[in-house]
Swiss-Prot record:
This is Secreted RxLR effector protein 68. It comes from the Eukaryota. It comes from Plasmopara viticola. Effector that acts as a broad suppressor of cell death to interrupt plant immunity. Inhibits cell death induced by cell death-inducing proteins, including the PAMP elicitor INF1 from P.infestans. Has a conserved RxLR motif that acts to carry the protein into the host cell cytoplasm. Lacks the 'so-called' EER motif, which is found closely behind the RxLR motif in most of RxLR effector family members, but the presence of an EER motif is not always essential for the translocation of every RxLR effector into host cells, or for inducing a hypersensitive response. It is found in: Secreted; Host cytoplasm; Host nucleus. Induction: Expression is up-regulated at later stages of infection. Its main location: secreted. Belongs to the RxLR effector family. GO terms for cellular component: extracellular region; host cell cytoplasm; host cell nucleus. Residues 1-29 form the signal peptide.
Amino acid sequence: MRCVCASIRRTRIIEFLMFFALSSSTASCAPFSVSNVTHASPRPRWLRWHEKTSMAGNPVSLSIATPNGAKSSSICSANTVGFTPDTYTCPDIRDSSTDTLSRSKRISSLSLTKPISSSSESETKVLSAS
């Protein structure tokens, strides 16, 4: 009985280590990955993700698309800098067709553009949200 329990325990530890190795190697491929999107009320709109580059604290551009096709964008600035997940705030995201705050709309997608280096290159991450 003791032998069977030790074997099961060893198998689970190996599975956990393999899962951890795969998940950490996958996460390091992207320059950034969105971990959580929340809508603060009434303003601003918060976008949080884990930093994968040394560009922590730099402004990013956030574009919002609503189901009716309206789009808007805003420059977001960092609230925190460091190796913890940075929180960016986008205070004036507006629906360009009606000039109303997008928080009253159902958001179909967010497109996040973040500088890769000091050059004009950028990396875009598109995610779904509702």
